[in-house]
């Protein structure tokens, strides 16, 4: 078994186990954890987008790499810092120290260090993943993640319903910490092929001169901004306004996960035939269209969640698979510098979007009204805003593919 193949296999196990903690910070589990710490709507918005906002620190990735002189060493230092910090969450809950500022601080530190870890991991995996059939490799990797995430989510939801309140979150965060530490050990066995370390001059100038990459960069920043305005509040609406329990949400997650597995297999084969960009464009369209359903989500229309799950899994499986592989196609080589610029742009856009979304969510959720027997919540206005922004971007973007760039406007 050659070292590169061994690293590819390890990357699957490492990622699946690592999600034992990461899932606690996302979706309805992350929202529930934030509410357990007494988080307000703006704080929930920030917590929900910390993985994106933390990518500001990517600008330091090339400099740190030059200091330590090894991608693997840099990755392990950052991974050690991020995953060890997770232990403070169950400790804080056990001691009854549950202020939202503390949770924000812990998760911010975790996300910053994890963001740098991801930078070096992407650079390494680009050198060990097969150039031919990359989409199929990552689709199979994502299928395995979907299976493990499904069982982890069910397990955590079962604990939270069996042991409600603070004790339930102490238990699942303790499991999450154990997962994070095991994944750290597996990272240590990754192979780092020989790689020339760039001196990092002209970071913005070199990448933005690429006429194929510039439209992708512009699309990625607008995508991040418009998505994070609402992304933390879907689960918030389910838990607070619709008052759904964790068991139901976990069952819905199983339904979505099973569909996701099928779509990952489908998109992996299609992307290798027609290209990742075409599949990505379809996914983006579906992700925006599904937000319209959330205008009608309340306790009397729970069945719409299943329709939303179908559209969402078809769309997000395409996005999760092809957003990364499209980047691999557009960049001649995914080094720390080019990935840092992309991540910085994503972080800046996500920060602005989360601040805008958090501010309006705190204000809008005070209002409810009845129309034709249907109860509307003020926060649902934000869901419609995402769709409007997408159509506005299409109008402003126009024809962007004439010079070989990413077709954002005409692709739909």
Predicted regions and their residues:
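Helix-to-loop junctions at the C-terminal end of transmembrane segments
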Residues: 57-73, 160-161, 263-276, 361
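Hydrophobic core of transmembrane alpha-helices in multi-pass small-molecule transporters
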Residues: 16, 85-86, 98-117, 302-319
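Transmembrane alpha-helix termini and helix-breaking/packing motifs in multi-pass membrane transporters
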Residues: 31-36, 63, 67, 90-95, ...
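Intracellular juxtamembrane helix-capping segments at the cytosolic ends
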Residues: 114-129, 318-333
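Juxtamembrane intracellular "pre-TM" segments in multi-pass secondary transporters
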Residues: 1-5, 192-220, 404-412
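Cytoplasmic membrane-interface "Motif A"-like loop-to-helix N-cap segments
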Residues: 67-82, 140, 165-167, 272-285, ...
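Helix-loop boundary and gating motifs at the non-cytosolic
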Residues: 1-58, 62-65, 72, 87, ...
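C-terminal ends and interior cores of transmembrane alpha-helices
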Residues: 79-98, 161-162, 285-300
């Amino acid at each position: 078994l050659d070292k590169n193949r061994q690293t590819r296999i390890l990357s699957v196990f490492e990622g699946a186990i690592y999600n034992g903690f990461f899932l606690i910070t996302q979706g309805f589990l992350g929202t529930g954890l934030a509410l357990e710490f007494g988080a307000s709507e703006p704080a929930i918005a920030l917590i929900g987008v910390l993985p994106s906002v933390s990518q500001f620190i990517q600008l330091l990735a090339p400099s740190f790499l030059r200091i330590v002189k090894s991608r693997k060493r840099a990755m392990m230092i950052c991974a050690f810092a991020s995953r060890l910090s997770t232990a403070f969450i169950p400790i804080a809950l056990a001691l009854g120290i549950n202020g939202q500022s503390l949770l924000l601080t812990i998760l911010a530190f975790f996300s910053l260090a994890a963001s740098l870890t991801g930078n070096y991991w992407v650079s390494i995996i680009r050198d060990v993943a097969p150039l031919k059939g990359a989409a199929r490799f990552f689709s199979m990797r994502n299928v395995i993640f979907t299976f493990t995430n499904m069982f982890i989510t069910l397990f955590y939801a079962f604990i939270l319903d069996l042991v409600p309140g603070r004790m339930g979150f102490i238990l699942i965060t303790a499991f999450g910490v154990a997962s994070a530490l095991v994944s750290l050990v597996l990272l240590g066995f990754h192979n780092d092929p020989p790689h020339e370390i760039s001196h990092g001059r002209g970071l913005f100038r070199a990448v933005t001169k690429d006429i194929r990459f510039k439209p992708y960069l512009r699309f990625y920043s607008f995508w991040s901004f418009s998505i994070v305005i609402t992304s933390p509040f879907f689960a918030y609406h389910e838990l607070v306004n619709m008052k759904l329990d964790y068991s139901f949400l976990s069952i819905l997650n199983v339904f979505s996960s099973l569909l996701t597995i099928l779509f990952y297999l489908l998109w992996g084969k299609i992307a290798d035939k027609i290209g990742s960009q075409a599949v990505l464009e379809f996914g983006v369209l579906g992700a925006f269209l599904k937000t319209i359903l959330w205008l009608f989500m309340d306790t009397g229309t729970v069945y719409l969640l299943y329709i939303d799950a179908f559209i969402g899994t078809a769309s997000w499986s395409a996005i999760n698979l092809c957003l990364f592989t499209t980047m691999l196609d557009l960049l001649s080589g995914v080094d720390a510098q080019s990935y840092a610029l992309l991540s910085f742009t994503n972080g800046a856009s996500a920060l602005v979007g989360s601040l805008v979304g958090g501010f309006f969510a705190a204000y809008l959720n005070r209002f409810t009204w009845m129309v034709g027997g249907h109860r509307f919540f003020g926060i649902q206005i934000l869901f419609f805003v995402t769709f409007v922004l997408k159509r506005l971007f299409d109008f402003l973007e126009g024809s962007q593919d004439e010079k070989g760039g990413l077709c954002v406007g005409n692709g739909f």
